[in-house]
């Protein structure tokens, strides 16, 4: 459990300790799956300490959830900080570091459903500008991507949907060909969007 601590500084320190404890530099290759805050921590770690054996990264990208820290701080600042600590404030205004070097193969999993908190904060999220779902615009250097009918909370538990595509990307450098490369709906805030049944 590297993420998240009470602040981004504490979280970065936890990641350094994790990397040292497990001697990441000794592996032939390091492949990572990064969620939103995790991408910030990995990028800052690589920028400061380097990780030349990092070969592949799959990013969870959410056009709605990536606006959550700022949206919460705009509307519920005291509640947000009380619930999640100073890390929420940190994430709402931090300068995002550059991604790893071009030799690192990047894949994207793009969420197409807003969480319940982001449905409450829809007006704040939309006020920040258009929501971009074209994966080649989200990350022009990404090798491949696919879209999911999941929200950010589901991304932590729906490995029945995520597991095989991630393993396929790590083995072949691309996601399975039958996965959707285009956005799945016009309104990610629509709570009536169908949720996939659990695959057992």
What positions do the PLM features span?
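Serine-dependent carboxylesterase/thioesterase catalytic core
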Residues: 5-103
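C-terminal catalytic-base region of ester-bond hydrolases, centering on the histidine
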Residues: 101-200
């Amino acid at each position: 459990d590297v993420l998240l601590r009470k602040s981004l500084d504490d979280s970065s320190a936890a990641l350094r300790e994790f990397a040292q404890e497990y001697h990441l530099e000794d592996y032939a290759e390091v492949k990572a799956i990064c969620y939103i805050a995790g991408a910030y921590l990995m990028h800052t770690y690589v920028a400061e300490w380097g990780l030349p054996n990092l070969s592949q990264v799959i990013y969870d990208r959410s056009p709605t959830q990536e606006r959550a820290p700022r949206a919460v701080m705009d509307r519920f600042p005291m509640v947000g900080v009380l619930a999640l600590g100073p890390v929420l404030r940190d994430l709402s205004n931090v300068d995002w570091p550059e991604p790893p070097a071009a030799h690192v193969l990047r894949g994207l999993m793009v969420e197409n459903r807003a969480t319940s908190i982001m449905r409450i904060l829809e007006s704040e999220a939309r006020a920040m500008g258009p929501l971009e779902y074209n994966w080649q615009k989200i990350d022009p250097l990404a090798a491949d991507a696919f879209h999911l009918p999941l929200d950010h909370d589901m991304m932590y538990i729906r490995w029945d949907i995520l597991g095989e595509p991630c393993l396929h990307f790590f083995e072949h450098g691309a996601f399975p060909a039958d996965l959707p490369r285009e956005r799945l709906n016009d309104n990610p805030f629509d709570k009536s969007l169908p949720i996939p049944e659990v695959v057992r």
